[in-house]
């Protein structure tokens, strides 16, 4: 991304440098005189789109956005060479905000199209000469297009990062008790193995035993595990091991005389041991691979830390909009925290935070989410 931003900085700088100073001054004049009207007209048109209105219906937000749009128009159309780097950073910041609250890129692109459409009559109704109007329009449109390209590219990057964080949170929430889940599944596959070994050794028969894919572990892996760990190489290895052993198992079930032969029986049991051993090793590696997602947990309070708050808020806002239900966020500030640390020491302060988080979590209903907002604040949604 750094190389891309450098290239766009050079292009934007070139546009400003090559433009006639008089034309730049007239573009800035248009922006200062008409930014307020353009922002009002912009949101009037954009809000006609039902999808866009989801993000713009709140009156307070709309007022903030209108003033922000005014500033954006003035900044972009009044750009000097020394402003370019700052303007690129502004586009990046706006894109990050759009990605964080889930505004689709197509709405952003529609907004730019609307802006260029309503800018045209404003420029051509001015008292400039025909040649000046054309040059001002070209400079303004090119400036907006560069800003749009930077914002869109930054949005795509931020949206991709946000999507990865959403996926990380999904895995984290599913595997919050990863160690317990790992041991449960290892115990499950070992129980299946022991059951078969006993039947083979005592009866030389598999009886009503199930193939691995239909046993408890196999069902968990195929219906949950594969989804939890999607994209990790070990998943494919475990799938092949299950599939290969099911073939051996089904062949043995069809020809039970195999187990009456001592050497074939020993071979079958060794195949079971080898398969289960490999699966357990790979399963441990899978859980170790996702254990890095535990950085999403605050070490002290064992609550979700700020890393996942944007993901959680985005999800909760979307749910509230979809269902038409109110959404509240409670910020709990642990008072006199510095005084406690200074008087009684950090260990006492840490213990108080642990106690507050424990009691808060204990009193919350299951559907509520408690997270650590900062060193002394808890957030509830």
Curated annotation (Swiss-Prot):
PROSITE patterns with a match to the protein in the record: GGDEF
One Gene Ontology term from the biological process aspect of the record: cell adhesion involved in single-species biofilm formation
Keyword set includes Mitochondrion: no
Site residues (Transition state stabilizer), renumbered to this chain: 338
Keyword entries, A-Z: GTP-binding, Heme, Iron, Magnesium, Metal-binding, Nucleotide-binding, Transferase
Residues the entry annotates as binding Mg(2+): 333
Transmembrane segments: none
Site (Involved in oxygen binding and important for the stability of the Fe(II)-O(2) complex): 43
Reactions listed under catalytic activity: 2 GTP = 3',3'-c-di-GMP + 2 diphosphate
InterPro entries: Diguanylate_Cyclase, DosC_2nd, DosC_GS, GGDEF_dom, Globin-like_sf, Globin-sensor_dom, Globin/Proto, Nucleotide_cyclase
Top EC class for this record: transferase
Binding site for substrate: 341, 350
Entry's EC annotation: 2.7.7.65
Entry GO CC: plasma membrane
Cofactor requirement: heme; Mg(2+)
Site (Important for oxygen binding and stability of the Fe(II)-O(2) complex): 60
Domain remarks: Is composed of an N-terminal sensory globin-fold domain that binds heme and oxygen, and a C-terminal GGDEF diguanylate cyclase domain.
Protein name as it appears in the record: Diguanylate cyclase DosC
Gene giving rise to this polypeptide: dosC
């Amino acid at each position: 991304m750094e190389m891309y931003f450098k290239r766009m900085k050079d292009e934007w700088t070139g546009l400003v440098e090559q433009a006639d100073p008089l034309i730049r001054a007239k573009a800035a004049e248009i922006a200062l005189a008409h930014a307020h009207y353009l922002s009002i007209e912009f949101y009037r048109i954009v809000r006609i789109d039902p999808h866009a209105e989801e993000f713009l219906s709140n009156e307070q937000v709309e007022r903030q956005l209108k003033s922000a749009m005014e500033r954006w128009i003035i900044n972009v159309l009044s750009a000097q060479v020394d402003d370019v780097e700052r303007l690129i950073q502004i586009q990046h910041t706006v894109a990050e905000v759009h990605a964080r609250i889930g505004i689709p890129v197509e709405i952003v692109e529609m907004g730019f199209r609307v802006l260029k459409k309503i800018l045209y009559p404003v420029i051509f109704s001015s008292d400039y000469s025909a040649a000046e109007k054309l040059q001002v329009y070209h400079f303004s449109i090119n400036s907006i297009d560069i800003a749009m390209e930077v914002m869109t590219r930054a949005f795509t990057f931020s949206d991709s990062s946000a999507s990865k964080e959403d996926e990380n949170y999904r895995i984290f929430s599913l595997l919050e008790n990863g160690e317990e889940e790992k041991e449960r599944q290892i115990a499950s596959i070992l129980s299946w193995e022991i059951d078969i070994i006993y039947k083979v050794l005592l009866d030389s028969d598999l009886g009503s035993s199930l193939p691995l894919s239909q046993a408890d572990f196999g069902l968990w892996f195929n219906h949950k595990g594969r989804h939890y760990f999607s994209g990790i190489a070990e998943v494919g290895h475990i799938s092949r091991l299950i599939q290969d052993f099911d073939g051996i198992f089904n062949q043995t079930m069809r020809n039970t005389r195999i187990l009456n032969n001592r050497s074939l029986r020993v071979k079958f049991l060794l195949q079971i041991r080898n398969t289960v051993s490999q699966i357990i090793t790979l399963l441990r590696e899978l859980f170790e691979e996702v254990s890095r997602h535990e950085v999403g947990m605050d070490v002290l309070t064992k609550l979700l830390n700020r890393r996942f708050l944007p993901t959680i808020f985005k999800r909760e806002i979307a749910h509230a909009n979809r269902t038409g239900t109110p959404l509240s966020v409670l910020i709990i500030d642990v008072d006199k925290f510095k005084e406690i640390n200074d008087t009684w020491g950090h260990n006492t302060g840490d213990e108080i935070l642990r106690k507050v988080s424990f009691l808060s979590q204990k009193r919350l209903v299951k559907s509520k989410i408690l997270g650590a907002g900062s060193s002394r604040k808890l957030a509830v949604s």
